């Protein structure tokens, strides 16, 4: 009788527990399969594109950017897929031939059509930002500047993209967007967290790089000063990016891009020339070039040196002397007046330099040509190499660099000397802080410059607050799924083992 009772209890318990375990196991298996299939289902590529045209003083470049749509608020996900340099000068040179602007832009806009899938054309934003060349034109005539921009807008509106307008950006904007670009690409705005720690850590002790930009008509310096009040409100910008506040110093020196600085130097030096011959230390020995006086005074940058000369043309004759060239350039910087605790030049406030700087655009292109972009090259070594380069005869230079256009080749002595003068005497870098200047062309395949920062700002892809993210990474998620599956499997095994316990186990339950 007792054996029968024990058998009935065992049978009853076995059936019920097995039913529960079996049902739970089936549900768990179905759930795991469903999650696994859903998680690993191949998804179509969901990307977005953006186009920015950099209408500079000497030329226009078109940049195409691409990013995954679902990650557009993450740091560093936007990358450059194409750069197209428009053939010809900057748009400010089309004042007297605005009807040619459409043809001027055609090749690069057609290239954009080819690169971006047709299905994406209508939702791809196009922005054109004009910089110092157009700022100078607007100083001469706002009407002429508006006419050029109107024709540019009409031309770009004819393409199947989402044209967002053309405008002249301020020097302050140009500096700020360049700063945003290099720090975005370097990942300086992101903050990583260790899996086993609730304390965040930075990839680098210095949170941001400073930005040094040199164009044809202006130069910008932008950085976050450490423990220093920005004494001039016009040079102060506040950003809140990814949940962190940045107090940024920026200034754009109009007329101090390398091309306009050369025009300034020539206009200054010709004032003291005894005749129509200008012996110039910033050009190689043996170099000669005739310059029209009318061309010299075309730009607003030379107005302060304008005077009536007894000749219509003058000839530059190079003598190739770095030290004399350097001294001539320094005369462009007024350091006698400073209404603040310290200044760069021309009475412009400049806080103490802090940390690393990325130097791009013409800073990079000139130094790369001179083979001086290596971080191991000291400032003293750069100066010595510039002395030797400038002293080389023009005929020898032409032979050594036969593939370079003479217009550009002839100006590298001046440009290299100007960069040294600007960085050392203009911005007050020293031999020690020179080592913190990084001459940058591209970062992870994207050009260093203001265009990416401009697009990121206008498309609101840099949020003020850190975007929300899933609490677990994909690998952690998979690990936990496997772990819980093993736990479920172990419980099932234990349950089965229970039913194989000796008979006295079941007696105790009765």
Swiss-Prot record:
The terms describing its cellular component in GO are:
basement membrane; caveola; external side of plasma membrane; extracellular exosome; membrane; plasma membrane
| PTMs per UniProt | N-glycosylated. The N-terminus is blocked.
- Membrane topology note: Multi-pass membrane protein
| GO terms for biological process, alphabetical | ADP catabolic process; blood coagulation; cell adhesion; G protein-coupled receptor signaling pathway; nucleoside diphosphate catabolic process; platelet aggregation
Gene3D superfamilies from the xrefs?
A: 3.30.420.40, Exopolyphosphatase. Domain 2 (3.30.420.150)
- Where does the UniProt entry say this protein principally localizes? membrane
The active site consists of 174 (proton acceptor)
| Residue intervals annotated with topology Cytoplasmic | 1-16, 500-510
Glycosylated residues, chain numbering: 73, 227, 292, 334, 371, 457
Q: Which PROSITE patterns match?
A: GDA1_CD39_NTPASE (PS01238)
Q: Which cofactor does it need?
A: Ca(2+); Mg(2+)
Would the keyword Lipoprotein turn up in this protein's UniProt record?
yes
CDD domains, A to Z = ASKHA_NBD_NTPDase1 (cd24110)
Task: Tell me the protein family, please.
Answer: Belongs to the GDA1/CD39 NTPase family.
Q: Using the UniProt entry, name the condition the protein is associated with.
A: Spastic paraplegia 64, autosomal recessive: A form of spastic paraplegia, a neurodegenerative disorder characterized by a slow, gradual, progressive weakness and spasticity of the lower limbs. Rate of progression and the severity of symptoms are quite variable. Initial symptoms may include difficulty with balance, weakness and stiffness in the legs, muscle spasms, and dragging the toes when walking. In some forms of the disorder, bladder symptoms (such as incontinence) may appear, or the weakness and stiffness may spread to other parts of the body.
* Name of the protein this chain belongs to: Ectonucleoside triphosphate diphosphohydrolase 1
The record lists the organism as Homo sapiens
What is the gene called?
Answer: ENTPD1
């Amino acid at each position: 009788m007792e054996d029968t009772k024990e058998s009935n209890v065992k049978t009853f318990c076995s059936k019920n527990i097995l039913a529960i375990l079996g049902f739970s196991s089936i549900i768990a298996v179905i759930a795991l399969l469903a999650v696994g299939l859903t998680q690993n289902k191949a998804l179509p590529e969901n990307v977005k594109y953006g186009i920015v045209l950099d209408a500079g003083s000497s030329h226009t470049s078109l940049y195409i950017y691409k990013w995954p749509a679902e990650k557009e608020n993450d740091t560093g996900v936007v990358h450059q897929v194409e750069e197209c340099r428009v053939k010809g000068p900057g748009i400010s040179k089309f004042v007297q031939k605005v009807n040619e602007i459409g043809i001027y832009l055609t090749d690069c806009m057609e290239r954009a059509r080819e690169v971006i899938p047709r299905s994406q054309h209508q939702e791809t934003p196009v922005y054109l930002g004009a910089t110092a060349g157009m700022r100078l034109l607007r100083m001469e005539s706002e009407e002429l500047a508006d006419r050029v921009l109107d024709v540019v807008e009409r031309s770009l509106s004819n393409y199947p993209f989402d044209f967002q307008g053309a405008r002249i950006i301020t020097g302050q904007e140009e500096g700020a967007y360049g700063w945003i670009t290099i720090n975005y690409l370097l990942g300086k705005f992101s903050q990583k967290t260790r899996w086993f720690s609730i304390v965040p850590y930075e990839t680098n002790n210095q949170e941001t790089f400073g930005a040094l930009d040199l164009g044809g008509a202006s130069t910008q310096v932008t950085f976050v000063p450490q423990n220093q009040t920005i004494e001039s409100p016009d040079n102060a910008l506040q950003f809140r990016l990814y949940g962190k506040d940045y107090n940024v110093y920026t200034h754009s020196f109009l007329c101090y891009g390398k091309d306009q600085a050369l025009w300034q130097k020539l206009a200054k030096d010709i004032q003291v020339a005894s005749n129509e011959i200008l012996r110039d230390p910033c050009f190689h020995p043996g170099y000669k070039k005739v310059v029209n006086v009318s061309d010299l005074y075309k730009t607003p940058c030379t107005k302060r040196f304008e005077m009536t000369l007894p000749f219509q043309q003058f000839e530059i004759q190079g003598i190739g002397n770095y030290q004399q060239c350097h001294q001539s350039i320094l005369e462009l910087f007024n350091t006698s007046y400073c209404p603040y605790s310290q200044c760069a030049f021309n009475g412009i406030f400049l806080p103490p330099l802090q940390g690393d700087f990325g130097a791009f655009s013409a800073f990079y292109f000139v130094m790369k040509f001179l083979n001086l972009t290596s971080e191991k090259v000291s400032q003293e070594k750069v100066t010595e190499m510039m002395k030797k380069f400038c002293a080389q005869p023009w005929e020898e230079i032409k032979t050594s660099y036969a593939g370079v256009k003479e217009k550009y080749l002839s100006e590298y002595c001046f440009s290299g000397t100007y960069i040294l003068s600007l960085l050392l005497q203009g911005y007050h870098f020293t031999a020690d802080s020179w080592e913190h200047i990084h001459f940058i062309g591209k970062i992870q395949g994207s050009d260093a410059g203001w265009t990416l920062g401009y697009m990121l700002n206008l498309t609101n892809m840099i949020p003020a607050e850190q975007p929300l993210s899933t609490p677990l990474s994909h690998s952690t998620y998979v690990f936990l799924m496997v772990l819980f599956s093993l736990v479920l499997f172990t419980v099932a095994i234990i349950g089965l083992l229970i039913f194989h316990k000796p008979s006295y186990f079941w007696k105790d339950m009765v």
